[in-house]
Amino acid sequence: MGDIEKGKKIFVQKCSQCHTVEKGGKHKTGPNLNGLFGRKTGQAEGFSYTDANKNKGITWGEDTLMEYLENPKKYIPGTKMIFAGIKKKSERADLIAYLKDATSK
């Protein structure tokens, strides 16, 4: 898969203003991502999701994140996430490798 260290840099630059990853981390504009892998969309406790996100019904994993992170609004029309996406597959792979590591601690 990707490079965790490169993924961490991408997370800090593109994601950390809205998301946290650590266990017990606060929700910001976006939900805390701890425990993301294996969780269904719209399920982080205490975060107010759109119906579109709650009703998508997919389980987050490498494949679903690879598609979602390319174009979030295309993957979940109606999501609140204002991020345009990451076009480079290698950058998405790095970010996913980091998220897989950082959200499981």
Swiss-Prot record:
GO terms for molecular function: electron transfer activity; heme binding; metal ion binding. It comes from Dromaius novaehollandiae (Emu). Electron carrier protein. The oxidized form of the cytochrome c heme group can accept an electron from the heme group of the cytochrome c1 subunit of cytochrome reductase. Cytochrome c then transfers this electron to the cytochrome oxidase complex, the final protein carrier in the mitochondrial electron-transport chain. Belongs to the cytochrome c family. The lineage of its organism: Eukaryota, Metazoa, Chordata, Craniata, Vertebrata. GO terms for cellular component: mitochondrial intermembrane space. Signal peptide: none annotated. This is Cytochrome c. It is found in: Mitochondrion intermembrane space. Keywords: Acetylation, Electron transport, Heme, Iron, Metal-binding, Mitochondrion, Respiratory chain, Transport. The keyword Transport applies. The modification N-acetylglycine is found at residue 2. Heme c binds at residues 15, 18-19, 81.
